[in-house]
């Protein structure tokens, strides 16, 4: 299957500063096969990306995917008070499936915001790895210390 993205503004990071230029991008089997100013290709789906920007995926170097469910929870406290009195007691109640679904939710959020690679640390990493594999993202994953 081929997809041709036409008329995109490509933001590349070649050199000392970002460079933007109009380009076409050909995808074959969901992988970039050609990037040129003008591509003519038959028998493919065409996406008109006029006034849209194509750029490298973002990289998030510090995540705790399974903690997405705690976002905003009792966040008016100092860090150690928040961890010891709010987060740790709730984390003790998390089941393996909770870790999986919280991590999967975070993967969806990363994808929707253009993040393609991340670094994650937590516990029950087997469940986080399972969610990441399902999502197709790239991750560097380690146990929290």
Roles of regions detected by a PLM:
Residues 1-41, 52-53:
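N-terminal metal-binding scaffold of metallo-dependent hydrolase/deaminase domains
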Residues 19, 73-76, 133-134:
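Short, glycine/charged-enriched secondary-structure capping and boundary segments
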Residues 100-145:
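Divalent metal-dependent hydrolysis catalytic cores, especially in the metallo-beta-lactamase
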Residues 36-44, 130-134:
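Short loop/helix-cap segments at secondary-structure boundaries that form the rim of catalytic
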Residues 14, 19, 67-71, 121, ...:
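Active-site-proximal flexible loops/turns
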Residues 69-100, 108, 140-145:
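Active-site gating loops and adjacent loop-to-helix segments of metal-dependent hydrolytic enzymes
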């Amino acid at each position: 299957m081929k997809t041709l993205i036409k008329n995109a503004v490509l933001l590349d990071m070649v050199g000392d500063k970002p460079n933007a230029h109009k380009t076409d991008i050909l995808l074959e089997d969901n992988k970039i096969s050609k990037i040129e100013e003008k591509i003519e290709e038959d028998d493919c789906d065409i996406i008109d990306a006029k006034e849209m920007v194509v750029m490298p995926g973002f990289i998030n170097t510090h995540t705790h995917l399974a903690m997405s469910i705690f976002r905003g929870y009792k966040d008016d406290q100092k860090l150690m008070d928040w961890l010891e009195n709010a987060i740790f007691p709730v984390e003790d109640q998390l089941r393996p499936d909770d870790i999986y679904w919280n991590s999967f939710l975070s993967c969806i959020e990363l994808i929707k915001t253009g993040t393609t690679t991340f670094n994650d640390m937590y516990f029950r990493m087997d469940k986080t790895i399972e969610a990441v594999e399902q999502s197709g993202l790239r991750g560097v994953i380690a146990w929290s210390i």
